[in-house]
């Protein structure tokens, strides 16, 4: 079973029901709703279609809603057609409402002219185009094109090294967050996080809206790297957002930061997603480059929970093939993990947390190793015990059994966890029989096979943070 998960961004290329079903069948475990594009109404339909496709395939699905954040973007272009910016040409960014061309384009950031100085660098489209500021008026920033290229509509604008007086949560983000809670999203991602306080504010808004969604902090600013440990503590998960991170810092530092972010997330038992340009060439080509295949494999070896596809599945020519290709690369990477990569339990050993649940997870993982068990089954109401076990990266199959469909969907994004839904049980004996029946019917365990069985805190069932070795078809243990 593939352990690292695949998060696919939905868009025009992948929103049709037949394509969505093929996307999930090819290996997507979760879908991303990018609030930078489209309307709430369109995304409501996208979520409904994704849930329906998952239901037809009888599998869980995580839905991650990615808030736009205070992204500075270029505006529209004449006729919606891309323009070519030539090196050494003069190009103007303006707050005036204009249909852009090769001489000027509008921006959604009213404070741009105020916040730049002559000589400052401005990067467009994830750094593909570089400008240098020559002068500014109240509305216009006049620049010289250093590195030209093709500019399409609504592309990102980055000001490397600049600290802009912009809140992490915009008014649009607040509306979209409330919408995401109403739609039953499984995760909410916050863009352009700079400090832990940004995460705490977003989490308070989720709670106020009546939600319990885990918050994923997107690490894409230099300030976020400076405050990484505090952000990891405050957030429920992290995303290595390499596009903006590479232009806000420098491209050669992205691999260094990626490893550091993943390591910090693993240490704190937080889900972590590696994103941006993983199979970029498959937007237009049916095969990835060798470098892209190596990139995906290295993210897996670094310890990421999930790898993400962006334009590859949202607007590319080969959305389903991109997912299938990524799944094959992950399979190969996991089968051929080098000795230098993290080594499961040994990698996490010795990190004392003081938590009983952590100790039980380590005990279960070591017990499974000692008796050569193939499966660790986790009975969980909240998903917490399963997530903690996952953070140890055991070799064994992790099977989470939960009565809560929301928990089942949430765990679909977490490394190595296979989830099964079950009806609520009234007592310990009924729960044990349910576990055995589920494992056998799913083809996970056979008669007389010994599995490691864990239970989180399930009030009223006599199961409380426990571990037992259980032989399928054998006598039920009297007490866990």
State where each predicted segment sits.
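Non-catalytic helical/linker scaffolds that mediate oligomerization, partner binding
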Residues: 1-480
């Amino acid at each position: 079973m593939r352990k690292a998960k695949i998060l696919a961004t939905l868009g025009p290329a992948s929103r049709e029901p037949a394509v969505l079903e093929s996307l999930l069948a090819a290996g997507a475990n979760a879908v991303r709703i990018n609030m930078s594009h489209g309307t709430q109404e369109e995304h409501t339909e996208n979520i409904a279609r994704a849930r329906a496709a998952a239901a037809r395939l009888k599998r869980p699905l995580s839905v991650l809603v990615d808030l736009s954040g205070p992204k500075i973007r270029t505006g529209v272009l004449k006729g919606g057609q891309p323009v070519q910016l030539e090196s050494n040409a003069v190009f103007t960014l303006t707050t005036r409402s204009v249909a852009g061309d090769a001489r000027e384009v509008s921006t959604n950031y009213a404070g741009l002219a105020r916040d730049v100085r002559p000589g400052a660098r401005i990067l467009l489209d994830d750094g593909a185009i570089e400008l240098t500021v020559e002068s500014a008026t109240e509305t216009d920033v006049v620049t010289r094109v250093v590195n030209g290229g093709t500019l399409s509509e609504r592309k990102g604008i980055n000001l490397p090294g600049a600290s802009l007086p912009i809140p992490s949560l915009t008014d649009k983000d607040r509306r979209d967050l409330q919408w995401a809670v109403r739609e039953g999203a499984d995760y909410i991602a916050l863009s352009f996080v700079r400090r832990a306080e940004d995460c705490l504010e977003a989490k308070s808004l989720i709670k106020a809206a009546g939600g319990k969604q885990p918050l994923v902090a997107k690490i894409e600013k230099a300030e976020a790297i400076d405050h990484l440990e505090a952000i990891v503590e405050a957030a429920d998960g992290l995303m290595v957002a390499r596009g903006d991170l590479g232009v806000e810092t420098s491209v050669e530092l992205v691999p260094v930061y990626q490893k550091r972010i993943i390591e910090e997330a693993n240490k704190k038992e937080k889900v972590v997603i590696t994103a941006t340009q993983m199979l970029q060439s498959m937007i237009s080509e049916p095969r990835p480059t060798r470098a892209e295949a190596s990139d995906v494999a290295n993210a897996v070896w670094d310890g990421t929970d999930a790898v993400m596809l962006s334009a590859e599945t949202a607007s590319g020519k080969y959305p389903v093939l991109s997912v299938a290709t990524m799944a094959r690369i992950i399979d190969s990477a996991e089968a051929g993990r080098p000795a230098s990569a993290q080594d499961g339990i040994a990698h996490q050993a010795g990190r004392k947390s003081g938590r009983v649940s952590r100790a039980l997870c380590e005990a279960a993982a070591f017990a499974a190793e000692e008796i050569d068990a193939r499966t660790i089954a986790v009975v969980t109401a909240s998903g917490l015990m399963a997530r903690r076990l996952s953070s140890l990266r055991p070799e064994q199959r992790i099977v989470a059994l939960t009565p809560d469909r929301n928990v089942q969907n949430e765990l679909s994004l977490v490394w190595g966890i296979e989830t099964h839904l079950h009806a609520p049980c009234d007592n310990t004996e009924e729960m044990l029989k349910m576990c055995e029946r589920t494992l056998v019917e799913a083809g996970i365990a056979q008669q007389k096979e010994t599995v490691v069985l864990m239970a989180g805190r399930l009030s009223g069932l006599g199961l409380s943070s426990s571990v037992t070795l259980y032989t399928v078809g054998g006598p039920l243990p009297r007490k866990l």
